[in-house]
């Protein structure tokens, strides 16, 4: 007999910092003093995709991980470090590497003072200066873990050696699965598909879960 949907256990929700009261935040951190901080970008990834494609992807992964593990999830930093935009793609915007680095340092320093002992910084943008700005964030004692979602091996799913070699196609498939209403026809015509997007998303989520949230914490 199939379970009654009305009696099924409710699906866990992400622990969204901006929607929680101070008491709820304190209770969450007392149970698990970690914080997920997604870092996005506003840039052209494909002519048929929204400018915030990388942010949309990292938002979905952050929400899923927060819900699965009950870890506090900070509001997304929407801007990152991008290459200089081509003129035909207006509104691409970039922070300087130093600016992003300083902003993240200020954020984690403040949160560390409130008892957070591990930061999980997620991004879906593999531009080297962007990753350098994130990976050099420092703390006094808290652990900082930086995750480039596209560093996960996806070659067997995409047919290319590195995700960055077909970044537009990877984003297109992911968004066809996650937010199909935001994908224009020209992105679908590139060979991207929701089926591939689901496989990519599940691979990324599983690998991050295994390596960051399920792996034993190394002894100091």
Which residues are covered by each model-predicted region?
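Extended, histidine- and acidic-residue-enriched regions that form the cofactor-binding/catalytic faces
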Residues: 2-220
